[in-house]
C-alpha cells in the first residue's frame, strides 16, 4: 500500500503549481509571503509541539484501538438519549454522503433546493407531531431548544414578565442549561411555583424525567388565565400515539429528534426541535425554511424571515444561532419518510407494549413503579438498593439510571428486545406479563398525521435511494465545486476523517455512561484538548459548546463569572468592532452584556483612538472586547497586541473570535497575542463538515485564570452548562482528532501558508479588474480577501446579487456577500483547492466583469441580460420561445471551460424573497387542505 503524507492529499496545490502562483503574487517563497502578511510581533517562531504525523491507515488503526476501550453496553438510561436503528440506506446515502455533509448553510437558495426541501419536510414533521403551525429548521439540542423557548416567552411579554415556572420534573441536564440562560437574562426559574401575573411561561415535560405523564389541565387553565405561555418538552416518538400538545394548550413545544434514526454519539450531534403558535412566529430563533416561487412561478424554497437573525439584527436578534443541526434534522426526516406514519406508530406501539409488559411483571410481584401513566420509561422504587441493582444490570451488559438511593429509572427504546426486558425484570425478582393494557395518558391521536404525499412515497430501498439522490442532485456542495465563502473555511472534509463517526464504538455510547465505560472517548478528548492547547496557547479547552455561536456565549459567560468572582459585578459592557460577525453582538446580549460598537478605519483596521476613548470612558464597567483575528476584512492588523494590552489595562478581558483561526495555525497563537478566551470552529479550521447548516462544534480555550469558569455539567456536579451533554457533539470530535493526527505540526503550518498563498493569488488575479478593498501593511491579504464589486453596480447596474446568481451558471457557489461591507464579495479559497479550480473561479469573476461591460456598451439592455436573469435552468434554456438578446450558449455555458457533461443545473431560477416572506408557508398542509 502506497502511503503518502496525508497533508499532500489534503492540500490542493502541486509543488510546480505553487511556484507559478508565487510568481503571480510576485514573491520568491511562501515564507517570504507569510512574513509580509503576518506582523513579526506575533510570529510563533517555533514548530508546534505535536505528535509526528501518521498516515490515514495508521491514524484509523490508532483511533480504532482507542475507541475499542469504550464498552458497548446496551443503554436503558434514557434521559433524552435513546438507542435507535439507523437504516443503512440513510446512513450510506445521506449521513456518509459528501453531497449532503459538505454543503454550506443554504443562504444561496437556488443551489440549495434539495436540503431546503428536506428541511421543509422536517418542519412539516414537527408541526404534525406538535400540532403547532410554525417550526424552526432545527436547533442545537433539546436543552438549548428549551432555553430558546423561555427567551421567546420573555420577549413575547416585551421583557416585562420575569418568572418561569417549572410545573414538572425536567431532565437535570436540561434544567441546568435553562438556569444558565435565565441567569444572564435576569429571569427567575423556579419549580412548582405559583403562577402569577408576572409569570412569562410555565414549562411542562411530556413525559417527565421519571417517565410519567401527569394531568396538566388545571395548571394550563391557570396559566392561560394569567397570560402565561405554555411550553412543553415532548418526546417525538410518544407524540405519534398521543394527542398533539397544541390541542391541550401548548404555545411552544420543544424536544430532540435524536431517536429518529440519529446515533447517541456520546452526546451528539442531534437536532433539537422547536415549534410555536402563529402569534410567536417572528420571535422564533434560528432558521426557518419557507416556500416561495421563482421567476417562472415554480415552487422553490428559501430561508425565510431572516430579518430576525443575528447576521442582520445583531444584538437585537431573536437568538445568536448561526449554525444549527441541518444534517441531523435531515437524517431524522429521512427516517420518518422511510418508516412513514404507520411505521413510526408501529415502533412506538412496540416500545410502549414492551414497557407495559415489564411494568406489569413488576407490579405482579409487588414492586412499586412511580406514575400511573407512561410511554417507554418508568421509575422503580427499590428502597436503598438502587446502586446495587444498577451494578447487577451492568454486569449483564445493560446500563440503567440511578435516580437516587431509592429509585432506578429504566427507559426502553427501538432497540430493546423481549430478552432485554426479561433480564431487567429478573433483577427485581419478576418476569414479563404476556398481555398488558396501554398506559398512555388521555386520548390518543384522533386524527391522521403525516398525510402529505412525501411521507408515503417511499416503499422500498430503491425508492429511498433515489429520493435522496434526487434531492442531493439539486444542490451544489464541495463534491461538485469550490465553495469560496469568506470567513467560512469550506476546506476538504477527508473521507478518512469522517469514517470513524459511524463506528459503533463512537456512535453508540450514551453521554451519561460512566467514565470507565467511555475510556476511549476520555482518552481521545484528553489528547485533543492537549493538541488544541498547544495550537492556541491556552491552558484548558471545553468541548461543550456545540456551535461557534455557543462558544462565543460560553466564553463570554466565563468572562462574566470571572469578574463576578472578583466582586466586579458592574463589568457587563462589551466592546465590539463595527466589522464583527453578527453572532458577536447577539452572543454578548445573550450573556447579559451591553454592546458598545467600536469604529473601524477606512483601511479596515480597528480605530485605535476610538477604542482607547471608549475603553477609558467605560473603564469601570468594561468586561470584554470581542475581536476577530485576522479581521473580517481579511487582514492581519499590526496593532493587535496593543489592542489586547489596552483592554487589559482598563480591566477587561479579550475575547478572540476564532472564525479565522485557519490563518493562524502553526504561525501564531491567540493566547500569545493576548487573548484570554477564544472559540475554535472545528467545522472550519479543523475539518468537521458544515452539513448544509450544521453540525458545528465551537470549543473554547481559556487562559489559566479563566479555567474555573468554563462550562460545567450536572453529571459532574458542576454548574453553568451551555449544552445538554458534557462534551457537546462528542462523536464528531474524532474528525478533528484524525485531522490533526494525520497533518502533524508541519502539515498544519503548511495548510495555513497555502491558504494565505491561495488568497493572495486570487487577489492578484482579480485586481486586474476589481479593487481589493483591504490589504495589510505590505500590500498582502490574509487567508481571504474582499473584492469590491460596487463599481459594476455604479457603472452598469449589476448588483452583488446578480453576480452571485450568475456564478451559479459558471458552476460556483457565491462567496460571502455584503459582509462586512455591503455590495462586496468576501472570498476564502482555503488550502484544499487545486490551482485549476481557483483559476476557473477567477476566470468566472473576470468573465462576469466583461459581461457587465456589454450592458454598458449597449449590447444587452440593463433589464434583459444574463446577469439579471441568472441563474438559468435547463428547462428555461430549452424553451422553444427563447427571446433573449443573448444566446442559450451565453446563458448556460458562458465559459469555454465548462464541461457540458459535468454542468451543474440549478433546479429553479431566481427565488422571489419578498413573496416568500409576505405569505409565509413553512410546512406542507395535510392531504386535502389547500394553502
UniProtKB/Swiss-Prot annotation:
Modified residues (N6-(pyridoxal phosphate)lysine): 684
Keyword terms, alphabetized: Oxidoreductase, Pyridoxal phosphate
EC number from the UniProt entry: 1.4.4.2
InterPro entries assigned: GcvP, GDC-P_C, GDC-P_N, GDC_P, PyrdxlP-dep_Trfase, PyrdxlP-dep_Trfase_major, PyrdxlP-dep_Trfase_small
Domain of life per record: Bacteria
Catalytic activity annotation: N(6)-[(R)-lipoyl]-L-lysyl-[glycine-cleavage complex H protein] + glycine + H(+) = N(6)-[(R)-S(8)-aminomethyldihydrolipoyl]-L-lysyl-[glycine-cleavage complex H protein] + CO2
Coiled-coil stretches: none
Cofactor(s) required, per the database record: pyridoxal 5'-phosphate
Any one GO cellular component localisation term in the record: glycine cleavage complex
Gene Ontology annotations of biological process type: glycine decarboxylation via glycine cleavage system
PANTHER family listed in its UniProt record: GLYCINE DEHYDROGENASE (DECARBOXYLATING), MITOCHONDRIAL, GLYCINE DEHYDROGENASE, DECARBOXYLATING
Protein role: The glycine cleavage system catalyzes the degradation of glycine. The P protein binds the alpha-amino group of glycine through its pyridoxal phosphate cofactor; CO(2) is released and the remaining methylamine moiety is then transferred to the lipoamide cofactor of the H protein.
Subunit structure: The glycine cleavage system is composed of four proteins: P, T, L and H.
Protein name as catalogued: Glycine dehydrogenase (decarboxylating)
Lineage: Bacteria, Pseudomonadati, Pseudomonadota, Alphaproteobacteria, Hyphomicrobiales
Gene of this entry: gcvP
